[in-house]
């Protein structure tokens, strides 16, 4: 049996095929342009889904018989779509400065202690909810037309299967998810003025969304029997892949941001955060995992390297 992992990153996506012994049979990667200015950090959601179909088509020609594909993605970034999943705007990256004022307004109304107790997060504009508020305030027509608010994992899963579901670990990156009840928090959403109906249904990590839609199967070369699974936020998946299952172990991962993902036997006390540190609590099955993020300034090194080939 062959299975595949599809990871949606902030600058590119990768599809890797494995056999039942865990041996890598092949991989495909596509990057997509990210636009960064002083006032906006953006990526075209359509570029992401086009790249997803490109890597699936490449692997579909070589390994059309895979049984399932698990989807992971980076957190925070989302897109408002119409009923069919077509993007209504350019997606804001989690590093986008917009949403800071909206986050402060939420914090003033609810208090940082209440937000932290519910979501496990110190309020910050990097999370989805303040940016959704920004869109509602600045692009009201986009919000009015929206039928879905999708983060990148559930965006891809929805377009592949027609099912709008988001795993718990990625839902925590919105600042609207209650880690105690593992549901969307209606009070926070009400204060934010965001309709819960637009959000995907939260499900445990590793929940199958369904089989590949006929049009997606035709485009990629995979079977309509292919199962698509909502796996997790990328750092949680990385910890599992590194064998970090037991309390006292952690994964340190350096990418666009520096992440430390430790495992706990139970929910640790909130405590205080050092300046610049942000925390989330992805909840995966029976284990509680705290994802401690050090939010780093993202330089333009990738842009420089791409713009000057052979000089870096």
Task: Give a label for each model feature.
Residues 32-38, 114-115, 165-172, 194-198:
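Gly-rich Lys/Arg/Thr-decorated short loops/hinges at beta-loop-alpha junctions or inter-strand turns
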Residues 96:
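Carbohydrate-associated surface elements
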Residues 12, 204-212, 258:
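Glycine-rich phosphate-binding loops at beta-strand->alpha-helix junctions
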Residues 1-89, 117, 217-218, 222-227:
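N-terminal glycine/serine-rich phosphate-binding loop of ATP-dependent small-molecule kinases
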Residues 61-93, 122-128, 157-178, 201-204, ...:
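Short beta-strand-loop/turn "lid" adjacent to the catalytic site in phosphate-handling enzymes
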